[in-house]
Amino acid sequence: KRVLITDVSDFRLEIARKCGIIDTLNVAKTPLKEGAKRLFGDEDFQAAFEVAGVESSIRSLMECIEKGSTIVVVAVFGKDPSLDMFYLGEHELKVNGTMMYRHEDYLTAIDQVSSGAIRLEPLISNHFLFEQYDEAYKFIDENGATSMKIIIKL
């Protein structure tokens, strides 16, 4: 099984690679359909997670995913996307929404991080003491495009 992570930020894709993701694609430079075809060949892909929250993203997924597959919408959309419901039905696509995680999800994540299967260190951009919370938020404001997670130690 292969996983393709997409983004419009080369910085974020580099962080994904440091976390162990092998296949990444900057969809601002290469269309999803072209990148997915290169990776998956004629089989396309059978599952997708929409986490961007923009109409063009979910439309691209619908156009590229294999017939009868599932798209899980994790993102919170800023405005209601317009989707081609005829295409959705004709291609037997399933669109599932999700808002919260279940207790079992946390247990699985803890096991995967503890075993080393998932590397989180590359996601951490900086550390601050609790007393430095103003400085931490200033850092976030000034470095939003090149930072991921900021740790504030209690």
Language-model regions, residue ranges each:
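Adenosine-nucleotide cofactor-binding segment
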Residues: K1-S60
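Residues in the short beta-alpha loop(s) of Rossmann-like NAD(P)-binding domains
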Residues: V8-S9, F77, Y101
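C-terminal hydrophobic helical "lid"/dimerization subdomain
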Residues: D10, R59-E63, H103-L154
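Conserved catalytic-site loops of classical short-chain dehydrogenases/reductases
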Residues: A47, T70-V72
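Helix-to-beta-strand junctions that scaffold the AdoMet/dcAdoMet cofactor pocket
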Residues: I65-K67
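Short glycine-centered segments of the SAM/dcSAM-binding site in methyltransferase folds
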Residues: S69-T70, K94
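Rossmann-fold NAD(P)-binding glycine/threonine-rich loop
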Residues: A75-L93, E104-D111
